[in-house]
A protein has these predicted regions:
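Cap/insert and terminal regions of metallo-dependent hydrolase folds
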Residues: 56-141, 145-147
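Short beta-strand/turn micro-motifs composed of small residues
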Residues: 49-50, 118
């Protein structure tokens, strides 16, 4: 590799500065060691979280995550594998999907905007368009991420 790269191990919780940018990280999934990040700059706050626990799986971590996301301008959330991916599985229609949990979190944390990322590669453009309609019908300022999207 021609570049000189430096890696820093993050502990949880952690707060640090990168110039004028404030970063806070917390553990959001003990099984995967996943961290959630709150990034603040000039009065704007972005929260990035993937692989999050459900409220029922770990109430304490879920509560910490809600505090991290509280009143964020933007929550980027893992909406992996919607029910549209699993239409051939009857049980999928009866289970709560990750995008629904993301909307629930956005509402509980009073998040202004929600972007769902990490879609299944088997989803067609039509399926993603249908998902976008579902998502916006539940949270008007929510959208699914797409290639080339600018935030």
């Amino acid at each position: 590799m021609l570049a000189n790269l430096t890696f820093q191990t993050l502990m949880s919780p952690a707060t640090f500065q990168i110039g004028d940018i404030s970063v806070e990280s917390i553990k959001i999934n003990p099984k995967t060691e996943a961290l959630g990040y709150q990034i603040s700059y000039r009065g704007y706050t972005l929260v990035y979280a993937t692989d999050t626990p459900s409220e029922h799986a770990d109430a304490e971590l879920f509560s910490s995550f809600l505090k991290l996301a509280d009143k964020a301008d933007l929550l980027i959330y893992d909406g992996t594998y919607s029910d549209l991916t699993y239409l051939h599985h009857h049980a999928a229609a009866e289970t709560v999907q990750p995008w629904e949990i993301g909307i629930d979190i956005a509402k509980k944390a009073n998040v202004k905007n929600l972007v769902l990322v990490h879609h299944s590669p088997v989803q067609t453009d039509t399926a993603l368009d249908q998902l976008q309609e579902k998502v916006q019908s539940r949270f008007a300022s929510a959208q699914i991420a797409y290639e080339g999207m600018t935030l």
